[in-house]
Amino acid sequence: MDQTPLSDAKSRLAAEVDGRADVLLDVSRRIHAQPELGYEEHFAHDLLTGVLKDAGLAVTRSARGVDTAFEARAGGIGPLVAVVCEYDALPGIGHACGHNVIAAAGLGAGLAAAALAEELGGQVLVVGTPAEEGGGGKVRLIDGGTFKGVDAALMVHPADADLTAMDVVALQQAHVTYTGEAAHAAAFPHRGRNALDAAVLGYLNVAALRQHIAAGERLHGIITDGGDRPNIVPAYARTEWIVRSPTVAGLEVLKTRFLACLEAGATAAGCEMDLEWIDPVYADMIDSQAIVERYRANAEALGRIVRVPSPQARVVGSTDMGNVSYVVPSIHPMIRVAPPGVPIHTPAFTGFAGGPEGDAAVLDGAKALAFTVADLWLDGGLVERAQGEWREAVAGRSGAVAGGA
């Protein structure tokens, strides 16, 4: 088959990734072996920025005032494509979300693209985004201006299957405290106001509400403080919650119903309640169909079979990449790291992320992303189609919250 400029570019990008395979796999394994929680990823930050700087990219460490974020840029003119890296881990189970794979695949794509950027007439920005697991690192970078002028943003995420997208829903966390009045639980129970009762009644109200919420909506919580001794009426109780809905607009409606459940519990127990909504809001994901179809073709050219997620087998999650998708056309495809049925956020997945399956995903992910960067650089109409599609999608989703406002 004759080589077109685009196919020739992809062949050369693949060679760039292969030539760096030892470095990329070493980075993935080292990050996997030294898991760091959100905003504490100093080892990963220094490792990734060191490799990027050694390769000649213009590196900004601690970008936008975020200590463990970074930006690395190459190229002069042409479409600016951001390749996103994540590298925070989970408490107790390490890289059970496979962020070591995300970091190394993004690194590989960025290095390969940077090597050809000047020649192919494009720009690449490798963005290191800390604290995806609840800390909203990307939101801080959005607010700081990282994605201004970016034409598209790309990343891959490990999973137990190759998929064009994950079902990303909007999310906000809440911390709730209840204040009552302590009393001896046997001698003077009538003098007490039981804060734990208020928390439990609120929890049960939310449990009843779950029967009557929309598909894709989720309410999950824990009681973090319910008193000190059973013979003392608890004067203080505390709960933590996560509220999810398919869109930011739907999230606001669900939050109102959720709040009513908790307030009713506090009223019934005669206690005071204070609810703190934790920023940032994680937005739902607007997947660029124009771009993800190119990613799919590129990944399948590497031998992977990439499916469109089935509505009957929804895997619901949340990510601050959703916020990025409200400010620039974005994709968040899933790349297989584990066998079917091994979910993320489990110890079993941690093992696969650091094993041969994770290594294969690093190299395939780097190539598929780099190929997609080339599509955006060399297909003159792709950026325009993606941006037109994106503007229409954003306009159709009212109540969007992209940054931290």
Task: Please report, for each region that a protein language model flagged, where it lies by residue.
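Short, small-residue-enriched loops and turns at beta-alpha junctions
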Residues: 34-39, 131-132, 161-163, 227-230, ...
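Acidic-glycine-rich active-site phosphate/pyrophosphate-binding loop
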Residues: 74-86, 165-178, 338-348
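Histidine/acidic-residue-rich, glycine-tolerant segments that coordinate divalent metal ions
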Residues: 68-71, 88-96, 100-101, 106-107, ...
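Histidine-centered active-site/metal-ligand motif
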Residues: 32-34, 88, 95, 99, ...
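Metal-dependent amide/peptide-bond hydrolase catalytic core
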Residues: 5, 196, 200-405
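Acidic/His- and Gly-rich active-site-bordering loop/insert found
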Residues: 3-121
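General small-molecule cofactor/ligand-binding pocket signal
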Residues: 60, 127, 274-276
